[in-house]
């Protein structure tokens, strides 16, 4: 039996990604999805949230493919090239997990890739760089430092102070853009 859950609502994360995608894509847009694994519940939830929000908000948007990359940048690179070669009018890529560097590398060698909007999860050095270079439009974060802090704090309060935590301690979905990490000129 678990004490509580500290983390992000991944379904909400997928819906957030879709909501952003709906705002930036043209009418009748086409999106390719790269999912870490269809067997991991967090990625299943992100995908379901994304699909549901797209169908509710922008039924004109078509999801043209869902491919697994097992968080590997090499597979994300290959999948991105496949999407772009098969669908020269691809408008967006949503990646639910790791491997964003592979998407960035593939888009570097594709003509007209500046017309492809990309949304990913997790703020890493790689995803921040891709934000700064405007390859990625949005990165959704889950505040890993805050999650770790809340885990220790909750455990301490439970063990030392005998305070029973809420069953769910939700970590909000954060949204980062290129402006979030722009270096200021002196």
Regions found by a protein language model. Give the residues of each.
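Hinge/cleft segment of the Venus flytrap/periplasmic-binding protein
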Residues: 143-186
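Hydrophobic alpha-helical segments within soluble ligand-binding/sensing domains
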Residues: 6-29, 76-77, 127, 143-160
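Short hydrophobic segments within beta-strands
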Residues: 34, 94-95, 176
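Conserved acidic residues
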Residues: 3, 91, 137
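Short beta-strand segments enriched in small/hydrophobic residues
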Residues: 3-4, 30-39
């Amino acid at each position: 039996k678990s004490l509580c859950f500290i983390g992000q609502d991944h379904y909400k994360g997928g819906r957030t990604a879709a909501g952003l995608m709906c705002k930036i894509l043209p009418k009748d847009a086409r999106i390719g999805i790269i999912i870490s694994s269809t067997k991991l519940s967090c990625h299943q939830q992100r995908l379901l949230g994304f699909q549901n929000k797209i169908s509710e908000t922008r039924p004109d948007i078509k999801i043209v493919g869902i491919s697994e990359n097992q968080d590997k940048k090499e597979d994300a690179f290959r999948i991105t090239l496949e999407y772009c070669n098969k669908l020269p009018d691809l408008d967006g890529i949503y990646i639910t997990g790791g491997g964003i560097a592979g998407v960035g590398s593939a888009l570097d060698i594709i003509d007209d890739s500046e017309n492809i909007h990309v949304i990913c999860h997790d703020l890493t050095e790689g995803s921040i760089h891709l934000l700064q270079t405007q390859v990625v439009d949005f990165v959704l974060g889950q505040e890993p430092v805050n999650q770790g802090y809340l885990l220790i704090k909750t455990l301490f309060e439970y063990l030392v102070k005998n305070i029973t935590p809420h069953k769910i301690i939700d970590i909000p979905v954060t949204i980062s853009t290129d402006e979030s990490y722009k270096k200021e000129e002196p």
